[in-house]
Amino acid sequence: MKFYKYCASGNDFVITNADRKEDRSALAKELCNRYEGIGADGFIVILPHEKYDFEWEFYNNDGSRAAMCGNGSRAAAHFVHHINKINPNMSFLTGAGVIKAKVNQDKVEVSLGKIKSVQNTFEELGKTWQLCNTGVPHLVHFCQNLDEFDTMLCQKMRQKYNANVNFVKILDENHLKVRTYERGVEDETLACGTGMGACFYLAFLNKKVQNKVKITPKSGEEVGFAYKNEELFFEGKVKYCFEANYNFS
């Protein structure tokens, strides 16, 4: 199997082309293993589609399926344009719906579409939370110090609510910093696109930031978010790392 390794804002992905759908959960887990495989946060399979430019299957690091991944969508768009030679303005089908993307050299902007749902704030484990679905569910906690981020606490919240967990600090009305515990990876990751999107949207909804901001995840790779016409837009750089062939175990 020929594969391509990509990075986007700190998240890394293994991407490959395929001509049909099938259960690749075991393969995803094998490929994403950082000790015995290639190592990645997620595995993306690009499939043909009659109506859209392509369809994808997205697998988490543990082999579970995910409806959506923000950074993964940008990596997939970069791959399909630069490797598969598809038009830079594209649309593709995910488990969370249709995603629109624009590729400009190493920068990719995607529309994550409309926010799926937002719940009221609630208190748990000594902190205030809000749940927002940007394609996948995210718990968000606004804090003054990102050192408050606690992996064990995040694990408890993730298990109870079956959601990703984010801590966000507002630096000013145009800049946020975010740390995310991702389900499917079951640990903190260097970045999470849908998580940053949830943090931005809730901050905007609560009138704490403007409708266009910069966000710095743990990786330090700054990305841009905007909310316009009831859609969430996400832009940042994507890096092609390498390509190789993988022999199945």
From Swiss-Prot:
Location, primary (coarse class): cytoplasm
Protein's GO biological process: lysine biosynthetic process via diaminopimelate
Locations listed in the record: Cytoplasm
Active site: C69, C192
Keyword Amino-acid biosynthesis found: yes
Coiled coil spans: none
Amino-acid positions noted as binding substrate in the UniProt annotation, renumbered to this chain: N11, N60, G70, N71, N164, E182, R183, G193, T194
Cytoplasm recorded as keyword: yes
UniProt EC number: 5.1.1.7
Superkingdom assignment: Bacteria
Listed GO MF terms: diaminopimelate epimerase activity
InterPro entries membership: DAP_epimerase_AS, DAP_epimerase_DapF
Keywords annotated in UniProt: Amino-acid biosynthesis, Cytoplasm, Isomerase, Lysine biosynthesis
Residues at the site labelled Could be important to modulate the pK values of the two catalytic cysteine residues: H138, E182
Enzyme class label: isomerase
Name of one Pfam family that matches: DAP_epimerase
Family assignment from sequence similarity: Belongs to the diaminopimelate epimerase family.
Subunit structure: Homodimer.
Functional summary from the UniProt entry: Catalyzes the stereoinversion of LL-2,6-diaminopimelate (L,L-DAP) to meso-diaminopimelate (meso-DAP), a precursor of L-lysine and an essential component of the bacterial peptidoglycan.
Record-linked HAMAP family: DAP_epimerase (MF_00197)
UniProt-recorded name of the protein: Diaminopimelate epimerase
Lineage of the species this protein comes from: Bacteria, Pseudomonadati, Campylobacterota, Epsilonproteobacteria, Campylobacterales
